[in-house]
């Protein structure tokens, strides 16, 4: 039995990117790097360099994700369509409680290696998974997060609590705290890992979804100009004379090309933003959050902040599509109008040609009549000369009588001959 070439790859796809097994206390640093195809290859090579420095095997040539334990820290590397994520996990000892600042997981990674991550940083986040009592939890939240922008909720049906301020701090990182303590409920290490992965994905997909917002704002200028141009063309078409229509059709075609070109360049971005927005909503549903008194939930924050941005992207996409359809309809109407006028011009031209042909036929018949008279005249003249000569030889009729008798015979013969010749020529051209 021959296996399908990609059987194992397809089978193992459902097991790709499994969540980490996590136990508090834990420090996590998460990076999202925008990367094109070349930078994604560089990312794989950059990862191989770190593994080589720690005497670990390199990733496979086509690897799209990797989890590796370096001892002092664990690294999770994932390759996506538009970006690459690096998640650094550092277990903490219980002595972290007495420290002024929470440890950052990125400190355990060679800083020179971090500084050279391929691509452009879209998102960077510090997240801590801790156990703490109510009083200490409030102190940690107050010390590390901005209370005026605080977002918090219980998650996994009350088995943990999550806090963040969705803000960039002076170091360029956003921050989040997850409390999984015995005072709430016992939370398995595997389920805690799934929770943290979903929280990181919410932040990642939120930022990637927002990539469509600058594009939507930039599209507004083009769309406003295009709509104004289309309105001007519509007014001009209403009052245009036939000789102006080709110019209007050319302007309309240029506008259609400009709008379609811009639509093609932005459609994939808007579609991607919509897909990432759906992922954000699904991940929020997955964490099963519930409200903490006095705080907005993640769902509340996204509804107030992210949803309007995504509506702007969707509005730009629908506006582009509507403008394209209106241009197409107007182009079809104008082309139909031009074609009808061309048909009318062609019919008028054919009528004029038929009229000229009838006139030519009448002239031809007139010329034929004159030709019969002229040929008859000359032939009768020749007969008169023959009759004069014949009279000397005893021809009984006078030359005048002979000429008079010859006129009808010659005229009929000439007319009949020209008629046959005309019919022959006509048949040869049909």
What are these regions (language model features)?
Residues 1-123:
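N-terminal pre-transmembrane cytosolic regions of membrane proteins
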Residues 19, 211-214, 218, 261, ...:
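Conserved aromatic-histidine-acidic binding/catalytic patches
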Residues 89-251, 257:
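Extended alpha-helical interaction modules
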Residues 168-185, 216-223, 227, 262-287, ...:
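Short, positively charged
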Residues 232, 279, 308, 315, ...:
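Cytosol-facing regions at membranes
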Residues 255-380:
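Membrane-associated alpha-helical segments
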Residues 358-430:
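Alpha-helical transmembrane anchor segments
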């Amino acid at each position: 039995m021959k296996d399908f070439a990609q059987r194992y790859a397809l089978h193992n796809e459902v097991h790709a990117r499994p969540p980490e097994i996590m136990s508090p206390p834990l420090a996590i640093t998460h990076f999202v790097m925008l990367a094109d195809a070349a930078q994604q290859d560089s990312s794989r090579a950059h990862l191989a360099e770190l593994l080589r420095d720690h005497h670990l095997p390199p990733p496979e040539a086509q690897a799209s994700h990797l989890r590796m334990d370096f001892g002092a820290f664990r690294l999770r590397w994932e390759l996506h369509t538009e970006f690459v994520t690096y998640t650094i996990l550092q277990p903490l000892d219980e002595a972290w409680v007495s420290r002024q600042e929470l440890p950052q997981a990125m400190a355990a990674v060679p800083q020179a290696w971090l500084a050279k991550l391929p691509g452009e940083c879209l998102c960077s986040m510090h997240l801590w998974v801790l156990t703490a009592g109510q009083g200490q939890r409030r102190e940690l939240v107050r010390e590390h997060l901005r209370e005026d922008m605080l977002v918090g909720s219980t998650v996994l049906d009350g088995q943990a609590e999550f806090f963040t301020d969705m803000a960039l701090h002076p170091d360029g990182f956003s921050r989040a705290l997850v409390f999984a303590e015995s005072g709430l409920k016992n939370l398995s290490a595997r389920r805690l890992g799934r929770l943290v992965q979903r929280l990181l994905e919410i932040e990642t997909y939120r930022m990637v979804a927002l990539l469509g917002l600058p594009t939507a704002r930039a599209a507004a200028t083009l769309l406003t100009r295009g709509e104004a141009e289309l309105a001007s063309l519509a007014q001009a078409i209403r009052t245009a004379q036939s000789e102006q229509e080709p110019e209007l059709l050319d302007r309309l075609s240029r506008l259609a090309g400009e709008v379609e070109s811009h639509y093609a360049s932005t459609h994939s971005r808007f579609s991607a933003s919509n897909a990432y927005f759906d992922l954000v909503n699904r991940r929020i549903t997955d964490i099963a959050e519930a409200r903490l008194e006095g705080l907005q939930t993640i769902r509340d924050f996204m509804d107030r902040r992210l949803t309007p941005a995504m509506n702007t992207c969707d509005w730009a996409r629908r506006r582009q599509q509507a403008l394209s359809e209106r241009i197409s309809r107007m182009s079809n109407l104008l082309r139909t109008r031009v074609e009808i006028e061309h048909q009318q011009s062609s019919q008028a031209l054919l009528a004029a040609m038929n009229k000229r042909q009838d006139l030519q036929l009448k002239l031809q018949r007139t010329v034929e009549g004159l030709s019969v008279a002229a040929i008859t005249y000359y032939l009768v003249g020749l007969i008169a000369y023959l009759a004069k000569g014949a009279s000397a030889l005893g021809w009984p009729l006078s030359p005048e009588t002979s000429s008079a008798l010859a006129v009808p015979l010659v005229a009929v013969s000439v007319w009949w001959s020209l008629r046959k010749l005309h019919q022959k020529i006509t048949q040869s051209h049909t």
